[in-house]
Amino acid sequence: MREILHIQGGQCGNQIGSKFWEVVNLEHGIDQTGRYVGDSELQLERVNVYYNEASCGRYVPRAVLMDLEPGTMDSVRSGPYGQIFRPDNFVFGQSGAGNNWAKGHYTEGAELIDSVLDVVRKEAENCDCLQGFQVCHSLGGGTGSGMGTLLISKIREEYPDRMMMTFSVFPSPKVSDTVVEPYNATLSVHQLVENADECMVLDNEALYDICFRTLKLSTPSFGDLNHLISATMSGVTCCLRFPGQLNSDLRKLAVNLIPFPRLHFFMVGFAPLTSRGSQQYRNLTVPELTQQMWDAKNMMCAADPRHGRYLTASAMFRGKMSTKEVDEQMLNVQNKNSSYFVEWIPNNVKSTVCDIPPTGLKMASTFIGNSTSIQEMFRRVSEQFTAMFRRKAFLHWYTGEGMDEMEFTEAESNMNDLVSEYQQYQDATADEEGEYEEEEAEYEQEETY
């Protein structure tokens, strides 16, 4: 069985993560004590992807929960599904990282990391054939960003050939809870570019907009935002957990989506998103799903795909539908909007179909796109970073934990390189082949070292 090991870190990661487990528990018919109460053998057929089987038929999530302060974990533990997790898999410190990346990455986090790795190792050894890891964290705080990236780099060392997928919540343009977010995010991206295989980019502001505009919620809570994220997370992996006509796994996803190794930051979207009131007035059809899924307002990060071009994209449809219709609709989108796709990657949109829809829906779809417009997010964070770094504002919090200014400069230039790489491929046309072949050769050389 192709298992996935789920890791959640920091306040944001633990809140998204616990919401995700609520969704997956529902889909697999597992109740709050870990007993199976479902009604279809399909729910159990590949339940091992996310669960270990314990004695007397209990299912236990293959999840590691970490944080540098006990608060969030206590609330996970006292929440509706708190008793389903294995108690040993809660790893927490007492000090907190105080929104400081250096504390999470170098001091406080470094003290806790070995006990986290012990739990990860234990879970990985129990796996039949571990496919990869999925990490939930935010990039604005201290623990999820600093300690999260530390863990990712340690796992990279120990399991170099396993997939590493992250769900990373970026700081939002207008909503900010700490002033040092640009520092933390830039230092994290510096790590993610090198050590992660695929990053699903999320941000609170885009999620707020979806709740507000599309779902018509007047005062969206973090619970509502996290519910959106968890729907997407469950959609990304549904092919692994349920039988389908066109299956995919984390590696196939990466192969189809990543044309150049550093460009692995994806926009995600989900359909159908309808307000509660108007649900019964709509009939879900494949064309409608497709239309909503490609809609710029549906993207869960604050970058507008219309400002760039898609290098590649992947769509996962769930429910009983005709694959032929899915393919026709996807082709239709590409033909009508051909200027938004790079022409030097033919057939760059892949679709997969999984027979089992999410709980409470007839059909649904998840969208993952590798668009050059994601540079807007990096550019925005980079501008904020530069504004503060130029004056060395707040730097003493980081240098006090033993960091060097050099590291900031490196992270800044790595992020700016990433932006210009996206820009370069956005402007590229199919007839400049010569230049690209040379560059690809350089890339391959870098890869082999």
From Swiss-Prot:
Q: Name one GO biological process term.
A: microtubule-based process
The residues the record assigns to binding GTP are Q11, E69, S138, G142, T143, G144, N204, N226
Supply the alphabetized keyword list: Cytoplasm, Cytoskeleton, GTP-binding, Magnesium, Metal-binding, Microtubule, Nucleotide-binding
The record's principal subcellular location, in a coarse class, is: cytoplasm
GO MF assignments = GTP binding; GTPase activity; metal ion binding; mRNA binding; structural constituent of cytoskeleton
For region Disordered, the annotated ranges are 422-449
The family database entries (Pfam families) matched by this protein are listed as: Tubulin, Tubulin_C
Positions of Mg(2+) binding = E69
Instruction: Locate the compositionally biased regions of type Acidic residues.
Output: 429-449
Return the GO cellular component terms, semicolon-separated. cytosol; Golgi apparatus; microtubule; peroxisome; plant-type cell wall; plasma membrane; plasmodesma; tubulin complex
Question: What does the UniProt entry say about where the protein is found?
Answer: Cytoplasm, Cytoskeleton
Spell out the coiled coil positions from the record.
Answer: none
| Necessary cofactors | Mg(2+)
The free-text function statement in the UniProt record for this protein reads: Tubulin is the major constituent of microtubules, a cylinder consisting of laterally associated linear protofilaments composed of alpha- and beta-tubulin heterodimers. Microtubules grow by the addition of GTP-tubulin dimers to the microtubule end, where a stabilizing cap forms. Below the cap, tubulin dimers are in GDP-bound state, owing to GTPase activity of alpha-tubulin.
Spell out the subunit comment.
Dimer of alpha and beta chains. A typical microtubule is a hollow water-filled tube with an outer diameter of 25 nm and an inner diameter of 15 nM. Alpha-beta heterodimers associate head-to-tail to form protofilaments running lengthwise along the microtubule wall with the beta-tubulin subunit facing the microtubule plus end conferring a structural polarity. Microtubules usually have 13 protofilaments but different protofilament numbers can be found in some organisms and specialized cells.
Q: Which family does it belong to?
A: Belongs to the tubulin family.
Note, other? There are nine genes coding for beta-tubulin.
- Please give the name of this protein: Tubulin beta-7 chain
The organism named in the record is Arabidopsis thaliana
